[in-house]
A protein has these predicted regions:
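Glycine-centered flexibility sites
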Residues: 91-94, 101-103, 131, 140, ...
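Short loop-to-beta-strand entry elements in the cores of soluble alpha/beta enzymes
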Residues: 128-135
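Amphipathic, small/basic residue-rich leader segments at the start of a protein or domain
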Residues: 1-127, 139, 143, 147
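Glycine-rich, Trp-frequent "lid" loop and neighboring beta-strands that shape
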Residues: 143-189
């Protein structure tokens, strides 16, 4: 369980600074001038502290609480809301994926998520919001973008992944169902 969070950041720093081409990524126009390889230690150390202080205290409780579905309402542990709000307000969540200069490269966001998940595994679900927002950002109509993205970026709303076929899991190739468009571009059968 996560209450006794213990994570040695040495391997993570090695992978990011010496094994992966993160320094090259920092040269991309979107990141150039915002990050340097020297920033990595500070960023990882800060997120390590956030994981220990914000995430880890809820680890055991959230594991035991799980998710409840009663009377048509889904309930998560109250700590989920507190942590989700914290990461959104401090730029470590969905707010980071806006298509603007200065956002974190995906490789760093994943490294940060690893630290957070190590401290409190149930909170990994918060990353689904980033995926859902990216999907809308890339493929959604302007109407959908205006409707969903502002509230997903500011942490008011979250996103999810719905697996409709238990036998397929996340293996898209094993999905048997099909969706056909209707006269309403928002609805598929």
């Amino acid at each position: 369980m996560s209450t006794s969070y213990s994570y040695n950041t040495r391997d993570l720093k090695f992978i990011l600074k010496e094994w992966l081409p993160v320094e090259e990524i920092f040269q991309y126009e979107k990141y150039n001038g915002y990050y340097t390889i020297e920033d990595l230690d500070m960023m990882i150390d800060q997120c390590h502290n956030i994981a220990a202080e914000v995430f880890a205290p809820y680890g055991d409780e959230m594991e035991e609480f799980g998710v409840k579905f009663e009377n048509g309402k889904t309930t998560v542990h109250p700590g989920f809301t507190r942590i989700f709000k914290y990461i959104q307000e401090n730029g470590w969540g969905t707010s980071n994926i806006e298509e603007t200069e200065g956002t974190l490269p995906e490789v760093l966001q994943c490294a940060i998520y690893e630290l957070f998940q190590a401290a409190c595994p149930p909170m990994r679900a918060h990353a689904l919001t980033s995926g859902a927002a990216r999907l809308i950002q890339e493929f959604g109509s302007e109407e959908l973008k205006k409707m969903f993205l502002p509230k997903m970026f500011d942490g008011t709303w979250a996103g999810t992944m719905c697996l409709t076929e238990a036998t397929a899991g996340t293996d898209v190739g094993d999905i048997l169902s099909k969706a056909y468009p209707t006269s309403d571009p928002r609805i598929y059968k």
